[in-house]
């Protein structure tokens, strides 16, 4: 391993020990905000510190085994130990390289999830409902909180569009690769001939930004309409214009929110989604420029990005970005998504490592 990388790892290991000491300090414990920030930093440094400690131990093992090679009686055993230690050292170096990759600052944030029915009419709306249920199950398993911001139901069930905020540890980092087109192939319940239909939905995942980082939105650029809510909320919903529709005139982005009884709360929610959408549009432009020079696994939430096909008759799900096919569709639709999410994260890390080695 390069001396510059070892020096960086030593500094991170020292910082990990320093943060550990600070977390036990009475002044830190009294300051809840600082305590939370240090706890997050400690968690982020723990893996790299542990891995580096293991690597240091293996280097000592290699040194010991090399010294034993001079002893004729110990040579054979030393050769075995040396081979094992070198293999372990290589594995740990690869892990450390991944742990040192630049982190996306948005990865730890909450996220807005949008699922929209595309081509396929009623069947697309039903599939949008299935996808939202799949993500909700996944969130539940990870102990994340799902809060519906806005929903437009399909005529025969499912959703034409649904927007939810998902809160918890590392939500955006896990879900960001879901953005893009999701295609379903199955026999609709209304199909009497048993023919397979193909429908599509688009998914967009955007990080929730803290107020300080929200893009500046000029109030003059907004058209705000109020209307009567339709949906849950008891008798109150249809008696006041509590639902909000905000149009951002320069970009044409429209956000609706009718989940809360209070117009003020709906407006605040709609503005937070609008800020995230404007930020996402800016990020997509930047990624497009990057994608012209390098493969980009992050979808834009556009229908043209074909992420996955869910084939119900075959019980098959295929991720087209990494040519991964699994025959466990029922489990996937029940929210067991890690088997699809992990490989795409690993592929993304491999791309990052390739980009770094090219720069070097």
UniProtKB/Swiss-Prot annotation:
The modification N5-methylglutamine is found at residue 235. This is Peptide chain release factor 1. PROSITE patterns: RF_PROK_I. It comes from Escherichia coli O81 (strain ED1a). Methylated by PrmC. Methylation increases the termination efficiency of RF1. It comes from the Bacteria. GO terms for molecular function: translation release factor activity, codon specific. Belongs to the prokaryotic/mitochondrial release factor family. Peptide chain release factor 1 directs the termination of translation in response to the peptide chain termination codons UAG and UAA.
